[in-house]
């Protein structure tokens, strides 16, 4: 039969590229699970009362090429002015070797958070380097492996200051008036829910205020002034006040380390170490503290440990501080941070080394000195005598200056009374400085760069002598070796080879949705039209961004069944926090601010109780029944007991047990009956899109993990994006921003992220995914995700019982394999199985969540039947190995499972095990071998002997 032109055009071609199993494979799997079609399967599994009659209308699919052309036309509406706005964001020069070999490399961007250290040694080493950069520049003892952005790092510093403060009755936090406005905005938001009073005043007046537990100072103020706070910090320390300092990472190359001046906590943005502005993100924040406060620090910390053979190995240390273990008692609700961006900054420091970084920092400062000298020579006054890269220039005709700047396609900072701000950066040239002279002085200024350079080179007083760094930085060999591109390329490749990412194998982590991050989706993030915009540029310069964001928001509204979407939260945890704040402020608007009880099922993600605590709520746990579902009787009892104090419930759907609960609408009705709101966690949205929706189910607010359902890659532990969808009554209460007016905001709420649209430059990834899939493809993706999970469950259930199922023994998009009976019978644990899977070339499923002693498997729709069968065969082979242990063929203390994973060096070492080398490293069915570089890590050793900076280079060899 002759095909039509429409068929030949094949606008839905990408759907077949994204979805792993082809039509024939899907039918084979449907036969295996006993279903006639995808529609029949989802019709059986998803409760009838929540199934959508028609898919959301998000348009027809488009080919990769058509979608890229469409988005390119949108991006071209952005105007790329040269921005000297500063305020924590500057233009950068990302070394091409890092751009090509990391940012554009799926071996780096498709990896997951390094919970399995044996398959993560490469990015753990890069993160350890990031921590070393932080330690050297801040002068402190302990560093984290990144936070979400500078403003949220400030909020975390405030929370940490309260945790460690010896002034238990003090409840006030002092913020110096020269911090960036977006930092103050986020600090105020967090302080409100913690019940802290924020005082904003000149730093020198801090001692006038009583009952202060912590102080936030900014080393280089928002308008550019360098402050020597040594004496003030000393006085504050004598009063037992915890001192936090916000610092500029490039300025720290030249300036005294705040830690040496006595600061307890130092943080800032690592953006200007090679990460494009991207209209606000994503960017990594650095965070450091004194050793005595290490167990109160937020976020990931990479530590040096030992493996089973005694070799040096890296791991995430002190995880007992974190939300997935401590829940509402966690130091922070942070789950994903900004690993990919921290690693870009880390490798930027490796590539340039201390000499290169000093050259860059000195060049920026020299050009700033030249600009200052020329302006002063012509009679203009600078507001500050001491500066690094930012001048605050007093101008009589400010309107005229700004008009000339606009004509020259230049952005100056314009919100300073009777002055303009000018921040230079590593991209600034002498030609740029001459152009700035013309903008500020007119074309006939008569100034020459070389003449001015001679003057300032001999007599620069713009940095106080006491503020000049007098110690060496980045002395570790890793920062002094890889300065040729050949060496750098090979170093990065050596790190990449140590890790297991989606470019090598399926990552079947339950609740993580490790699906394809298609090349076409990733291409736009490096377009200069998206990468080079300052987040605070005039809105008319960002019309392309505004169109793309509005279109994406409209699609998400339709897919979720909500009325509005807020794009600001830059992680799932941040989205939870923002959604709960919207609920809190909604209740307050109705004079029901006393509603502060949050009901959370026992099966919930650890971020849920941690976020509820951050939002100032009390957590009350709701029991689950023997089938893993929310116990309705207990829910009613807890809701009734809470009464007028009920704020909300946080529920995940499908449940974290991998089941579509039949009573989800009844759950919503019970909570609404008692005046509460329903927060539906979007972690499992990949099993809803096109089939049902949170709004249709009856929820009021959800966050969406764009880094799960909508294809933003996990980046080895970030970036993420967690926008929130809300019903109309909550729309006035989503986050706002103090610097940028967000279109459609009805009331002014506090910000939760530094930038108005969070990590805006990765939103094109989700835009591309939805545009290429269309309504038809999105629904099919959800259906195939469900099919793949049920196929795995059906083939493995005899070897590993599936713990929870819904009607007809079905699961949703993931399944929980119960290892507890096997462990009781044989002594082999879920940990042993997880590590043995590495020998078979797989990342382990999620261990012991949401139920201890289990493995949770989520294959996603992107994995083909071939890959699913490879995983299933590996699991069945492991089960056969367990049977060998059970039968006594191999002793419990010496077998391939408890000794896993096995590394190459074992092949040439003496072999005394009761199983062969071949069984160890080439078990059944393994052909394309992934080699871990370390054996199983000693977690206890790592936490007892905490060491979080670079080890001697010999340890890596």
UniProtKB/Swiss-Prot annotation:
CC annotations in GO: cytosol; glycine cleavage complex
Catalytic activity, as annotated: N(6)-[(R)-lipoyl]-L-lysyl-[glycine-cleavage complex H protein] + glycine + H(+) = N(6)-[(R)-S(8)-aminomethyldihydrolipoyl]-L-lysyl-[glycine-cleavage complex H protein] + CO2
GO MF annotations, alphabetized: glycine binding; glycine dehydrogenase (decarboxylating) activity; pyridoxal phosphate binding
Keywords: Oxidoreductase, Pyridoxal phosphate
Residues bearing PTM N6-(pyridoxal phosphate)lysine: 708
Gene3D superfamilies per record: Aspartate Aminotransferase, domain 1, Type I PLP-dependent aspartate aminotransferase-like (Major domain)
Cofactor(s) the protein needs: pyridoxal 5'-phosphate
Superkingdom in the source lineage: Bacteria
Record-linked InterPro entries: GcvP (IPR003437), GDC-P_C (IPR049316), GDC-P_N (IPR049315), GDC_P (IPR020581), PyrdxlP-dep_Trfase (IPR015424), PyrdxlP-dep_Trfase_major (IPR015421), PyrdxlP-dep_Trfase_small (IPR015422)
Keyword Oxidoreductase attributed: yes
Transit peptide in keyword set: no
Family listed: Belongs to the GcvP family.
Biological role stated in the UniProt entry: The glycine cleavage system catalyzes the degradation of glycine. The P protein binds the alpha-amino group of glycine through its pyridoxal phosphate cofactor; CO(2) is released and the remaining methylamine moiety is then transferred to the lipoamide cofactor of the H protein.
HAMAP family named among the record's database cross-references: GcvP
Quaternary data: The glycine cleavage system is composed of four proteins: P, T, L and H.
Protein name: Glycine dehydrogenase (decarboxylating)
Organism of this sequence: Shigella flexneri
């Amino acid at each position: 039969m002759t095909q039509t032109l429409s068929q030949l055009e094949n606008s839905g071609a990408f759907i077949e590229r994204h979805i792993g199993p082809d039509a024939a494979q899907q039918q084979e799997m449907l036969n295996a699970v006993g279903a006639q079609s995808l529609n029949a399967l989802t019709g059986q599994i998803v409760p009838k009362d929540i199934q959508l009659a028609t898919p959301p209308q998000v348009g027809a699919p488009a080919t990769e090429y058509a979608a890229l052309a469409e988005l390119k036309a949108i991006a071209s509406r952005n105007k790329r002015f040269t921005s000297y706005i500063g305020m924590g964001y500057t233009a950068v020069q990302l070394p091409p070797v890092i751009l090509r070999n990391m940012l554009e490399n799926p071996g780096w961007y498709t990896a997951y958070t390094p919970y399995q250290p044996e398959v993560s040694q490469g990015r753990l080493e890069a993160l350890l380097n990031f921590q070393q950069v932080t330690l050297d520049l801040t002068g402190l003892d302990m560093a984290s492996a990144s936070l979400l952005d500078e403003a949220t790092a400030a909020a975390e510093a405030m929370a940490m200051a309260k945790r460690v403060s010896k002034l238990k009755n003090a409840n006030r936090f002092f913020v110096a008036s020269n911090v960036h406005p977006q930092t103050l905005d986020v600090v105020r938001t967090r302080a409100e829910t913690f019940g802290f009073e924020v005082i904003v005043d000149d730093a020198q007046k801090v001692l006038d205020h009583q009952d202060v537990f912590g102080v936030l100072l900014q080393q280089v103020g928002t308008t550019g002034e360098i402050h020597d706070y040594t004496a003030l910090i000393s006085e504050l320390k004598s009063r037992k006040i915890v001192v936090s300092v916000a610092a500029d990472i490039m300025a720290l190359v030249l300036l005294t380390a705040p830690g040496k001046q006595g600061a307890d906590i130092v943080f800032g943005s690592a953006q200007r170490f090679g990460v494009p502005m991207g209209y606000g993100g994503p960017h990594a924040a650095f965070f450091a503290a004194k050793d005595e406060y290490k167990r109160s620090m937020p976020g990931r910390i990479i530590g040096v440990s030992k493996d089973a053979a005694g070799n040096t190995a890296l791991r995430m240390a002190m995880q007992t501080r974190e939300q997935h273990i401590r829940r509402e008692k966690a130091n922070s609700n942070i789950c994903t941070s900004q690993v990919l961006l921290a690693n870009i900054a880390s490798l930027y420091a490796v590539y340039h080394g201390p000499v290169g970084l000093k050259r860059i920092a000195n060049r920026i400062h020299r050009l700033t000195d030249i600009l200052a000298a020329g302006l002063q020579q012509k009679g203009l006054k600078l507001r500050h005598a001491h500066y690094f890269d930012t001048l605050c220039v007093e101008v009589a005709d400010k309107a005229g200056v700004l008009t000339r700047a606009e004509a020259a396609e230049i952005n100056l900072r314009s919100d300073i009374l009777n002055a303009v701000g000018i921040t230079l950066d590593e991209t600034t040239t002498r030609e740029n400085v001459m152009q700035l002279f013309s903008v500020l002085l007119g074309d006939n200024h008569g100034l020459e760069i070389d003449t001015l350079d001679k003057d300032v080179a001999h007599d620069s007083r713009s940095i106080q002598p006491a503020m000049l760094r007098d110690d060496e930085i980045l002395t570790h060999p890793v920062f002094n070796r890889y300065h040729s591109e050949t060496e750098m390329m090979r170093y990065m490749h050596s790190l990449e080879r140590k890790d297991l990412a989606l470019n090598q194998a399926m990552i079947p982590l339950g609740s993580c949705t490790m699906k394809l991050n298609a090349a076409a989706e990733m291409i736009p993030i490096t377009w200069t039209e998206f990468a080079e915009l300052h987040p605070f540029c005039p809105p008319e310069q960002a019309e392309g961004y505004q169109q793309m964001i509005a279109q994406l928001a409209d699609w998400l509204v339709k897919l979720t069944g909500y009325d509005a979407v807020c794009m600001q939260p830059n992680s799932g945890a941040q989205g939870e926090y923002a959604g709960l704040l919207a609920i809190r402020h909604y209740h307050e608007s109705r004079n029901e601010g006393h509603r502060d009880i949050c009901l959370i099922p026992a099966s919930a993600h650890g971020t849920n109780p941690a976020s509820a605590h951050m939002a100032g709520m009390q957590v009350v746990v709701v029991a689950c029944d023997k089938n893993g579902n929310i116990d309705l009787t207990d829910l009613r009892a807890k809701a009734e007991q809470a009464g007028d104090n009920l704020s909300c419930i946080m529920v995940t759907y499908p449940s974290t047990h991998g089941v579509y609960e039949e009573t989800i609408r009844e759950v919503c009705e019970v909570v609404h009956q008692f005046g509460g709101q329903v927060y539906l966690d979007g972690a499992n949205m990949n099993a809803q899109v096109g089939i049902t929706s949170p709004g249709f189910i009856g929820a009021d607010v959800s966050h969406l993990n764009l880094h799960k359902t909508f294809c933003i890659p996990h980046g080895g532990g970030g970036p993420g994006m967690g926008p929130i969808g809300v019903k109309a009554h909550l729309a006035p209460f989503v986050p706002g921003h103090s610097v940028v007016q967000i279109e459609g905001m009805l009331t002014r709420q506090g910000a939760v992220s530094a930038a108005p649209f969070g990590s805006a430059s990765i939103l094109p990834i989700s835009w591309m995914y939805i545009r290429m899939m269309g309504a038809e493809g999105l629904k099919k993706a959800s259906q195939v995700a469900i099919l793949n999970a049920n196929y795995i469950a059906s083939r493995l259930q005899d070897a590993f019982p599936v713990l929870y199922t819904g009607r007809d023994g079905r699961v949703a998009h993931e399944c929980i394999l119960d290892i507890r009976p096997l462990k009781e019978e044989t002594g082999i644990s879920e940990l042993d199985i997880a590590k043995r899977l590495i020998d078979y070339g797989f990342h382990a499923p999620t261990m012991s969540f949401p139920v201890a002693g289990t493995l949770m498997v989520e294959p996603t729709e992107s994995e083909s039947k071939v890959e699913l069968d490879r995983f299933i065969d590996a699991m069945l082979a492991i089960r056969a190995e367990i049977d060998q242990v059970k039968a006594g063929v191999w002793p419990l203390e010496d077998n391939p499972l408890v000794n896993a994973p096995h590394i190459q060096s074992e092949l040439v070492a003496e072999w005394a095990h009761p199983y062969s080398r071949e069984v160890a490293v080439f078990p059944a069915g393994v052909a394309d071998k992934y080699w871990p570089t370390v054996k199983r890590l000693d977690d206890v050793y790592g936490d007892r002997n905490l060491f979080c900076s670079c080890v001697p280079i010999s340890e890596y060899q």
